[in-house]
């Protein structure tokens, strides 16, 4: 009986809680479907303001963040986190549809962001980056 309980606890410990903040519904569906398939918990929001509130009130293992969103964009979210809880920055994987300069990537790294990936995102690469944020 204790083996079953132990296995369940191991599964719970390996299950990641991921927040996806992106206004592109096609991308969020693809990422969340994949994460659900491999038994990770996934919260999806399409607005930066809502995502920022969730970051402030919940604990996530990893945060996938789009930079270009209407109203509250990824840059504003990064700035708020930097000022309010910089330890959260190491959990963030930035997604961007535009070409990101080497200088911007360097600035993200200096800020403490885990990674920056360009869309269309390679799901295996994203999963690897998500797992890196928890290690």
For the regions a protein language model found, what residue spans apply to each?
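Non-catalytic signal-transmission and effector/linker regions of two-component phosphorelay proteins
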Residues: 1-17, 124-135
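Helix N-cap/capping motif at the beta->alpha junctions
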Residues: 44-53, 74
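Hydrophobic/aromatic residues positioned on beta-strands within the core alpha/beta folds
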Residues: 95-96
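Short amphipathic alpha-helix used as the core "switch/output" element in two-component signaling
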Residues: 53, 75-88
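Active-site residues of response regulator receiver
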Residues: 66
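Receiver (REC) domain active-site loop signature in two-component systems and cognate sites
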Residues: 69
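Two-component/phosphorelay signaling modules centered on CheY-like receiver
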Residues: 25-43, 111
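Alpha4 helix (beta4-alpha4-beta5 surface) of REC/receiver domains from two-component response regulators
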Residues: 76, 99-115
């Amino acid at each position: 009986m204790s083996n079953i309980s132990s296995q369940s606890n191991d599964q719970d410990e390996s299950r990641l809680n991921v927040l996806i903040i992106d206004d592109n519904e096609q991308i969020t569906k693809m990422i969340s479907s994949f994460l659900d398939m491999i038994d990770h918990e996934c919260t999806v929001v399409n607005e930066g303001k809502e995502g920022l509130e969730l970051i402030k009130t919940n604990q996530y293992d990893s945060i996938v963040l789009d930079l270009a969103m209407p109203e509250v964009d990824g840059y504003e979210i990064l700035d708020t986190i930097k000022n309010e809880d910089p330890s959260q920055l190491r959990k963030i994987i930035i997604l961007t549809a535009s070409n990101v300069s080497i200088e911007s990537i360097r600035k993200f790294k200096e800020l403490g962001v885990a990674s920056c990936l360009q869309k269309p995102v390679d799901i295996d690469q994203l999963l690897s980056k998500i797992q890196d944020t928890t290690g």
